[in-house]
């Protein structure tokens, strides 16, 4: 799964801006972030490795689109005098959040433990790591939806029609 997320990330960074070149960057950032969150939720619920690899590649692609779009918007919005400091601050903040997540996520996973759910004749077992990923996916999807709504620069145009026109 580690290799597939980075394969998807590279594909999203390389091809996302080309595929969605006519799409609004502001809308693309929020939408891609929300879709990444939804695929992270799906990944947390899937126990089949082949399907998980496919979902992970798609997750990585939308994460790459979010990453490159976010950094592009940041570079366009920030003035030249403070751009270097702004990017340094963002990179430092990313590292701090990464260390915090690496410290806190195992604690959450251990606290949640393992749960078994029974549906009719089948049984599904989820461990704390899967539920922690599920929580992270829900948070990412909610943050993506909120950012999409806040940065919506064309309120009269629906997301679906904007995607269709961007892909033509």
Across the structure, where does each feature detected by a protein language model lie?
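C-terminal transmembrane bundle of multi-pass solute transporters/carriers
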Residues: 1-167
């Amino acid at each position: 799964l580690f290799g597939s997320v980075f394969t998807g990330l590279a594909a999203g960074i390389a091809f996302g801006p080309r595929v969605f070149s006519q799409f609004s960057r502001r809308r693309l950032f929020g939408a891609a972030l929300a879709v990444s969150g939804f695929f992270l939720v799906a990944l947390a619920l899937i126990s089949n490795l082949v399907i998980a690899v496919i979902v992970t590649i798609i997750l990585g692609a939308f994460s790459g689109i979010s990453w490159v779009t976010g950094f592009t918007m940041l570079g366009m919005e920030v003035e030249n005098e403070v751009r270097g400091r702004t990017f340094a601050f963002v990179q430092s903040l990313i590292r701090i959040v990464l260390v915090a997540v690496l410290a806190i996520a195992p604690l959450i996973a251990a606290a949640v433990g393992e749960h078994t759910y029974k549906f009719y004749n089948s049984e599904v077992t989820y461990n704390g790591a899967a539920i922690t990923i599920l929580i992270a996916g829900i948070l990412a999807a909610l943050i993506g939806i909120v950012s999409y709504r806040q940065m919506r620069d064309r309120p009269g145009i629906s997301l679906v029609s904007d995607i269709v026109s961007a892909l033509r």
